Each structure stands twice: as C-alpha cells, then as structure tokens.
C-alpha cells in the first residue's frame, strides 16, 4: 500500500476540495451533455452548507432539478427545504416530493439512489462512507471539505476517487 505523507495528503485534499468551486460549471456541462434531460440532484446533509450548495446548483442551469434530500434529522431537512423555497421564490420551481425526503443515518442511500449528481455536505466523519456508496452506484459527487477526519477515511476517499476516475465520474 502506498504511504500517505503530509505533502500528498494536502495536495489530494486541495484537489478534491477544489471541485466545490466548479459546481456551477460542471453541472452546466453535465446538464447540457445529456440531451436536454433534467439532471437529477440530491443533497445529503441539509445544514447551511448543503442548503447553500443546492441553491447554487439550481441556479447554475435550468435543467438541474432537486429530486431528493437526506439528513440525519428531519427538522434540519424541512428547515433546509423551506430556506431553498424562500431563496428561489418564483425564480426556480423546486418540488421535492415528501416520499423523497429521507431522515436517519441510512437516509443517504435512498437519496443517492434517486440522483445523477449528489452534493455531500454532511459532517466529515461520514463523508468517506457516503462518497464510496455514491461512486459504487455511478453517481457524480460534489463534497464539502475536509473529505474525512482520519487516515482510514482519507484512504477510503482516495480509493473511491480512483474508482470514480475509472468510471469517468466527477
């Protein structure tokens, strides 16, 4: 197994976190390359960061549609949806069906299964597992930094990132 040193860790983390800056451009490219098909978006982690990322993603292209939301706590999810609706009032139609609002610690799986693109804005201790699940299910992923909280989490993220490259996922 390749040894991870501080320099390679910082480099790989910077590259991974830089993906967040490209959300609008990448979503626009994905939406336009899919033959006018709506790009289905899910958010996992409905705090302030997740809510803001969803608003930014929805504003990036008219063919991006929020189809699912997941959070460990239902009240966070409902507060997030309310904020999204208020922020985009009349600008963009947002309609996440009740059956596509998932809460609990395994909620991320149900939301990810419904999407083409996933925003991971959960606490960093959960991101390696969520990222791995999304990549194994052929989903494009944007995630908050830091990507993990410990070395085993970082290794899991790096392994999943290599698989994402092979699958040509963003």
What are these regions (language model features)?
Residues 137-150:
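ADP-ribose/adenylate-binding Rossmann-like module
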Residues 75-76, 148-152:
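Short gly/pro/ser/thr-enriched loop/turn and capping motifs at secondary-structure boundaries
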């Amino acid at each position: 197994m390749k040894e991870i040193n501080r320099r390679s860790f910082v480099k790989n983390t910077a590259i991974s976190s830089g993906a967040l800056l490209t959300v609008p451009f990448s979503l626009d490219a994905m939406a336009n390359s899919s033959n006018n098909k709506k790009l289905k978006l899910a958010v996992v982690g409905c705090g302030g960061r997740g809510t803001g990322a969803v608003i930014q993603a929805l504003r990036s292209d008219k063919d991006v549609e929020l189809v699912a939301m997941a959070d460990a706590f239902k009240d966070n999810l409902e507060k997030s949806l309310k904020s999204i609706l208020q922020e985009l009032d009349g600008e963009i139609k947002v309609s996440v069906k009740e059956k596509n609002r998932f809460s609990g610690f395994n909620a991320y799986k149900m939301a990810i299964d419904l999407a083409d693109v996933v925003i991971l804005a959960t606490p960093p201790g959960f991101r390696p597992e969520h990222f791995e699940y999304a990549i194994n299910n052929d989903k494009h992923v944007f995630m908050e930094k830091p990507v993990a909280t410990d070395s085993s989490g970082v290794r899991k993220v790096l392994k999943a990132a290599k698989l994402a490259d092979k699958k040509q996922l963003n």
